[in-house]
Regions:
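Secondary-structure transition into beta-strands, especially the periplasmic turns and strand N-termini
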Residues: 1-6, 16-18, 64-74, 118-129, ...
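Flexible, solvent-exposed coil segments and beta strand-coil junctions
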Residues: 34-43, 89-99, 202-212, 216-217
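Acidic/histidine-rich catalytic neighborhood
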Residues: 3-11, 103, 113
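Transmembrane beta-strands of outer-membrane beta-barrel pores
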Residues: 10-14, 77-83, 118-120, 133-139
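Outer-membrane beta-barrel and related beta-rich outer-membrane complex signature
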Residues: 16-26, 85-89, 93, 128, ...
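Membrane-embedded beta-barrel scaffold of Gram-negative outer-membrane proteins
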Residues: 51-96, 127, 134
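Outer-membrane beta-barrel signature, preferentially recognizing the C-terminal barrel domain
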Residues: 24, 31-72, 100-122, 160-168, ...
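Conserved small-residue
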Residues: 102, 121-218
Length: 220
């Protein structure tokens, strides 16, 4: 006997994780001293445009069974679009704050999952085997300003890239002799045997402007 079952679903969910009760407005508190005077200061930066993160997810799959369930295959495909993505966005140090909870853009998750299992009974022997494989990806489809947004020391957000992609200096090998070291770097003490970093903007200086996106830690 062969059994075949199809599954199709759609769901819409909201997420408010990370949004405090008063995250939409700045907060002030007393007990702040400056010199010999006491006063009040802003202790929390508000965001009056903050809203829920929403996600629309589509799923399609099928279950296929052979020989009264002795061999079964299960496959699923999903697509999830998340809008108003909640993120703790870094702020410039001059603001007096390190970050602010914001709706920074949109993200798409998609993937395929497949599994197969078999059951075999021979006398007193009960044999069960299973195998599964999956492929899951995500990418940012929209970002505030559509500009690259560094986060932390070695990651960044960019439209078309995975969430939290690595943002690193690319190594091009080692300097073999002092003569090939660009003068600005030579003046800084770089010599033969030191790492040769890729000069992305070709100005002879290695700084944060030379970092590039180089994949992510998310497995396939």
């Amino acid at each position: 006997q062969t059994d075949l079952k199809f599954r199709l679903s759609y769901g819409k969910t909201g997420n408010q994780d990370g949004i405090g009760n008063y995250a939409w407005q700045p907060l002030m508190s007393g007990g702040i001293n400056y010199g010999n005077n006491s006063g009040m200061a802003v202790t929390s930066m508000g965001n009056n445009k903050l809203t829920w993160e929403t996600a629309d997810q589509y799923d399609f799959g099928f279950d296929l069974g052979f020989w009264n369930g002795k061999l079964n295959m299960i496959a699923d495909i999903y697509l999830k679009n998340t809008n108003n993505l909640l993120y703790s966005m870094p702020l410039h140090g001059t603001s007096g704050f390190t970050s602010i909870t914001s709706n920074i853009g949109s993200m798409r998750n998609y993937g395929v999952e497949f599994s197969i299992n078999g059951h075999l009974n021979i006398g007193k022997v009960n044999w069960t085997s299973s195998f599964n494989i999956s492929h899951n990806k995500n990418k940012l489809t929209k970002l505030l300003g559509d500009d690259l947004l560094p986060i932390g020391s070695n990651r960044a957000l960019k439209v078309g890239e995975e969430l939290g992609a690595f943002y690193l200096f690319q190594m091009d090998g080692l300097y073999q002799y002092d003569g090939e070291v660009p003068q600005p770097l030579y003046d800084l003490g770089v010599r033969a045997g030191d790492v040769k970093y890729h000069d992305a903007d070709n100005n002879g200086i290695i700084n944060d402007n030379d970092r590039v996106l180089t994949g992510s830690s998310n497995p396939d």
